[in-house]
Structures are given as structure tokens and as C-alpha cells.
Regions:
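A ubiquitous short alpha-helical element
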Residues: 8, 53-57, 457-460
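Generic, well-ordered alpha-helical segments
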Residues: 31, 57-65, 76, 80, ...
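Hydrophobic alpha-helical membrane-insertion signals
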Residues: 1-36
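Secretory-pathway/luminal and periplasmic proteins that interact with or process carbohydrate-rich
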Residues: 94-99
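Basic, short loop/linker segments at the boundary and entry of helix-turn-helix/winged-helix-like folds
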Residues: 29-71
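Anion-binding and metal-coordination hotspots
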Residues: 3, 70, 77-90, 101-102, ...
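Short, solvent-exposed coil/turn linker segments
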Residues: 25, 29, 38, 43-47, ...
């Protein structure tokens, strides 16, 4: 047998997958244009130590390291704590930030609950102050938008305030009847309020003592006859518990909302763009999230359980002033924010408000302009009197004061007294006489807002609002797949949203920095 010689030469470096190679410096492996370096550039400019609370017990992981890992995870839209734990074992960037530590998901959970919660707003402010200084952010212009985000609550766990009020009224009526029966049977009178559950509880105890003193036997189990006193006694106990439940539900709803979720009491049921039943208008538990942007960065965050954006504008702007000690010069928002209070607030704080009002777009349609019966299209004489399409005059009737607004608001009520003989009455009004409510101050504020919105600067600002404010929600919801809140309770939800916005701003800083480098 002839010997065969293999002349195939290999020019590949010997590869042994388990061979240790030096140096073990992960910073040499990470790309110099990686977002981690931009992240460290911002975070290292902040004194994170002052946000760390001291604690007793064994020394845990380095809190600065933990905070960096969590912020970097949210910057890369990694929200699951188990996913963060896995990243610390497999991703060299997280391994570099951890410095060979391997925190568990519970360690991250404890750190978020004990250290970040309560400090998230201050950390967000510090990060934004550094970014504004480095990127020279134009904070004079502020774009505002709001959205409803689904809460981490069961979809059928609703509690309605009106239902609780109706049930409470029925329960009070039954309690009054039951106490009346017990008074006749035991001669023990009740003089307190029927809404006082503690007093009713004391009355129940007195009934029980009366039964013990008079040797009234309580039948237990099925098939045993109960005395009238026992039946009324047990009925009153059930009704008192029902009354407590109704009062707790009404108190949980408060004065500003009409519903809440049993799973998350801070979540409110509201309409959203998408629901579980093919957009049939089913309510879902959620939170109202308000964001304000300047130069593509999120400048302010607010979470509330309000169902509309109108009432959130003033507290949102107050929180902005508290955060940065100044108000923006220009505020741009959509029609959800145009109201009497918001216009007056902008006037008071010397803010140029580009706030759309409710019918801003509809006023430009042909249908609106052709509707001669709308109060906006009625003729107005020099002396201020209104003239209907038939030439009939409206007479000033009275002033109506709106007590629900934050600023004094007086509406003029005008009435046409000759509508009975008008041939066009059916097309004009269904009432006996046509009444028109006019607020001259609000009309003046709307006219000023329309002038701003229709100007060239207003058109450009409205376009930028669509790009920046609505675009931010588009990135967070669609690109980052964050369309449902993970935690429960207002404080936890605020903490989570602050982390999301900090991660967004850190990634936006890196992206804008790369644009400047590569341009």
C-alpha cells in the first residue's frame, strides 16, 4: 500500500473556543461609536450619589453600578428585569457596566423600589440639564401632547361611581326599613345617621346583647326556622357591609373621575384608539400620559387619571416651571388643550400659546360656513346686537357665571323673543325661543389663537408638533413596543414612565451626537 501525503495547507489561526486570551478589557472590544459611551458621557456628569438613600444591613451591590445598568437597559428599551439580568451575563456592554457583578432580577427590583422610586423625577431633571447644556437645546419652544396608555389591570375589573351611588341610596333605604323593624321588635331606638357605619355597627352589637339577655335562640344551618329578630339582625349586618363597600368605592373614585379598576385603583376606565373587540368603543383601564418636547428631547412628564387633556395643562405647566424655574416662551398643543382656563393661564404667565380650540379645523370647512344658524355665523351690529338670518334681533337676557372654571368666567345669554312667528324656526331651534350663549373674552382669546395658528410661524410650529410630540409617542409605542404599563399604582407608574423617558432622551442624545459627527 502506497503512502499518501496530504499537501492541503491551512492558513487559519488555531481556534480553540475555550482558550483564555488576554487582555480581558471589555472596553477594547466595544465599538467606539456604541451608545454606551454616549450614555456614560451623560451619566458621569451627574452626581448620582446624592440620590442614594442610606440603609442598614449588609452591603449590597454598588448603587451607582445598579443605577447605570438600569438606565442603560431602558435606553436600549429593555424593560423586563429578567431580561436585564440576562443581559448582564451575555451582553459585553452590560458586563462592562456591571464590572464582573451578576445582579439578579430581584436585586434590580429592590433597587428600583428602594432607591429610584421617589428620586426618578430629580434624576430625570439632572439628566436633562446636562443634555440641554451639551446640545444647546432651545427650551423656549415647547410641544405638548398626551395619550392614554393601558394600565396593568384586568379589563373587566371596572367600578362605576354612578352605580355605587345608586346602590348606596338603595342600601340606605333598606337599612332604614330594617332598623325600623328592629326598633319595633326590641324597643331599641337608633338616633344616629344611617350613613354612619360605625354607629350602625354599635346598634348591631346592642341588638345582639338584647337577644342574649332575652334568651333569643339563633338558628344555624338550613332547615331551621329563624325568628324575625334574627332575620332582621342578619339583614342589617349584610346591609352595613354593603354600605361600607359603596362608600369606599365612591371615596376611591373621588371628585374628578367616575370609575376605577379593582386591580389598580389609580387606573381609570377610558376610551382608547384600540380595544379588544375590533374598535367597538369598549372601555379599558389606563392612565393619561402627558409629554413635552423641545428639540426632540422630552422635557417634562406627567401621569394622571384624567380622561381628557384639557384639565391637565395647568398642572403640567406648573410642574415644568417647578422643574426648570421658568416657563417656556411658546407652547404648541392640539385641540384637546384649547379652553378658557388654559388661554387665561397662558395670558397670565406671559406664554404665547399656539393652542387649537375645539372647532378650529371645522370652521374652515364649507359645511360650517354655509350653516347660517350657527351662532358664529350670526350677523352682529355695531352696537353688539345679534341678528338672526330672518332679520330678527336678539335681546340681552342675563349673565351666567361658570363656577367650574379656575378663572372667573361670565357668559352672556341672548334671546330672540319673536321665534314663534318665524317660518324657519324648525331649522333654527327646537326650543320655544332661540338662546345664544356668548363669552366675549373667550371669543377674543380664540381669535388671537387663530391668528397665531394661521400665521407662517404657527403653521411651521404645528408641523413640528406633529413630528416631535406625536413622533415621540410613535417611537415609544410602536418602535420600542411599549404600549402597556407594566406596574400598578400611581407612584410606580410615574417611576416607570420617568425611566422610559430618561432612556428615550439618552438614546436621542446619542443619535443627535452621531449625526453631528458623521455630518
Amino acid at each position: 500500500m502506497e503512502n499518501t501525503i496530504n499537501y492541503n495547507l491551512t492558513h487559519v489561526i488555531d481556534y480553540t473556543p475555550y482558550q483564555l486570551r488576554l487582555p480581558i478589557d471589555l472596553s477594547l472590544v466595544i465599538d467606539k461609536l456604541d451608545p454606551m459611551w454616549s450614555f456614560l458621557e451623560i451619566v458621569n456628569s451627574i452626581n448620582l450619589r446624592r440620590f442614594i438613600r442610606s440603609h442598614k444591613g449588609n452591603q449590597g451591590y454598588d448603587p451607582i453600578m445598579m443605577m447605570r445598568v438600569i438606565l442603560f437597559a431602558y435606553m436600549n428599551h429593555v424593560y423586563s428585569l429578567r431580561a436585564i439580568e440576562e443581559k448582564c451575563k451575555t451582553d459585553i456592554r452590560f458586563m462592562y457596566l456591571c464590572q464582573d457583578e451578576r445582579p439578579s432580577f430581584m436585586a434590580f427590583q429592590r433597587f428600583i423600589s428602594n432607591q429610584i422610586k421617589g428620586n426618578a423625577s430629580d434624576i430625570f431633571t439632572e439628566i436633562m440639564l446636562v443634555i440641554c447644556k451639551k446640545m444647546k437645546v432651545n427650551t423656549r419652544i415647547l410641544y405638548i401632547d398626551g395619550t392614554s396608555m393601558e394600565a396593568n389591570a384586568n379589563k373587566f375589573s371596572f367600578v362605576w361611581k354612578k352605580t355605587a351611588i345608586k346602590t348606596k341610596d338603595k342600601t340606605l333605604s333598606r337599612i332604614a326599613d330594617t332598623i325600623g323593624q328592629l326598633t319595633k321588635l326590641t324597643d331599641i331606638s337608633y338616633t344616629e345617621s344611617y350613613e354612619d357605619t360605625q354607629a350602625i355597627g354599635g346598634y348591631i352589637v346592642s341588638i345582639y346583647l338584647w337577644c342574649s339577655k332575652n334568651k333569643v335562640q339563633f338558628a344555624l344551618g338550613k332547615g331551621h326556622h329563624k325568628t324575625p329578630v334574627q332575620k332582621a339582625y342578619e339583614e342589617l349586618k349584610k346591609l352595613n357591609e354593603k354600605l361600607k363597600e359603596c362608600q369606599e368605592r365612591i371615596e376611591t373614585c373621588g371628585n374628578d373621575r367616575n370609575s376605577y379598576s379593582k386591580t389598580d385603583h389609580d387606573a381609570t376606565f377610558m376610551h382608547m384608539k384600540y380595544d379588544y373587540y375590533n374598535n367597538t368603543g369598549v372601555f379599558k383601564p389606563g392612565y393619561n400620559v402627558q409629554l413635552a418636547e423641545s428639540d426632540e428631547f422630552i422635557m417634562n412628564v406627567m401621569v394622571s387619571n384624567a380622561r381628557s387633556d384639557t384639565k391637565t395643562f395647568i398642572p403640567f405647566m406648573d410642574s415644568y416651571e417647578k422643574r426648570y424655574q421658568e416657563y417656556p416662551g411658546i407652547v404648541v398643543a392640539d385641540a384637546g388643550y384649547g379652553s378658557y382656563d388654559n388661554y387665561m393661564y397662558c395670558l397670565e404667565k406671559d406664554i404665547e400659546g399656539y393652542l387649537k380650540y375645539q372647532n378650529y379645523r371645522y370652521e374652515k370647512t364649507a359645511k360650517f360656513k354655509k350653516d347660517i344658524y350657527r351662532k358664529e355665523n350670526l350677523l352682529r351690529e355695531e352696537n353688539g346686537k345679534l341678528i338672526c338670518p330672518q332679520g330678527r334681533e336678539f335681546v340681552y337676557k342675563r349673565d351666567s357665571e361658570n363656577t367650574k372654571t379656575d378663572y372667573p368666567c361670565i357668559t352672556q345669554v341672548w334671546e330672540c323673543k319673536t321665534c314663534n312667528r318665524c317660518p324657519l324656526k324648525k331649522e333654527c331651534t327646537k326650543a320655544k325661543k332661540r338662546e345664544v350663549h356668548i363669552n366675549p373674552i373667550l371669543d377674543e382669546l380664540k381669535a388671537h389663537a387663530k391668528e397665531l395658528l394661521d400665521s407662517e410661524a404657527g403653521i411651521q410650529l404645528r408641523q413640528q408638533r406633529c413630528i416631535q410630540a406625536e413622533g415621540t409617542f410613535g417611537i415609544i409605542k410602536n418602535d420600542w413596543q411599549y404600549n402597556r404599563i407594566h406596574r400598578r399604582g400611581m407612584e410606580n407608574v410615574e417611576n416607570e414612565l420617568y425611566l422610559i423617558c430618561m432612556g428615550f432622551n439618552l438614546m436621542k442624545y446619542h443619535q443627535k451626537k452621531m449625526r453631528m459627527i458623521l455630518s
